[in-house]
Amino acid sequence: MPKTTHFAPETCTLCPRQCRADRAAGRIGFCGAGGALKAARAALHFWEEPCISGTRGSGTVFFSGCTLKCCFCQNYPISAEGLGKEISVGHLAEIFLDLQAQGAHNINLVTPGQWQPWIIAALDLARAQGLHLPIVCNTGGYETLESIERWRGYIDIWLADLKYVSPALSAELSAAPDYFAVARPGIDAMMAQAGHPVFDADGILQKGVILRHLALPGHVDDSFAVLDQMAAWNRADPGCFLPSVMSQYTPFYKAADHGIGRRITTYEYRRVVNYAMDLGLSDGYMQQKSSAKEEYTPSFDLTGV
């Protein structure tokens, strides 16, 4: 188990939950992670933004556990139910190199925060053996400033959510009343660390921040508040991130128990998109309404791990 000056596995404080689980003894933290690194899938993924997936796919590793508790999570078998396979740091390094050999445009780490020390150790090993692809941190946006700083020199691209502004809504849907209070300064730090988006000759992102927002049914007003924050960042530093507004919400997991047991309507989503455009958030991605399909969720069958 990795142990650094920044991580004491006996009292884990990697995420904003600060649950202090004794992961050295195999205790499970709030995030569902214990002492052994777990992943559920490693494969080329073609359903990210075009500048991430490109033509050859994003080399995506889905890690088990999550620091949020989203009742609508499409990845709930791995985020909430513990699905995954225990792997070593050395094997993870081999996975990164294999994805590179398959032609991936990048290495895409999905919900990596609870495994940060393990992943950093694996990246060090893989780089020593020739890994050279951009590294993507695919995060729900709920990260401590300390964690973001520890990723410096490892993460090239932040693919981050800004899910909510309302504390009541984030408490209800993700068990995180402090979500926006944590995410806003965290995203500030991500943008400061990564800088403005940089693309290669083929239009594939090499560094920068993509800021995602998934529109939820019945909560257009909170989407407006999220977009207001995005617009404020864009006004302060034009072009500092790429906005990505998504319509793919599908009522997975326990969504129906929390008043969001339906897909977003075309009218609701059009209101969100029009608001984004009115705010000048046009230099990014607006997902088609038809994207709300279960096929966008990969099969967590331990492929590649």
PLM features: residue spans?
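Conserved radical SAM core fold
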Residues: 79, 116, 141-144, 162-180, ...
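Alpha-helix N-cap and loop-to-helix initiation/capping positions
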Residues: 87, 114, 174-182, 260-267
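Hydrophobic faces of well-ordered beta-strands that scaffold small-molecule active sites
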Residues: 59, 107, 135-137, 158-160, ...
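Non-cysteine beta-strand/loop elements that form the S-adenosyl-L-methionine
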Residues: 152-169, 240-248
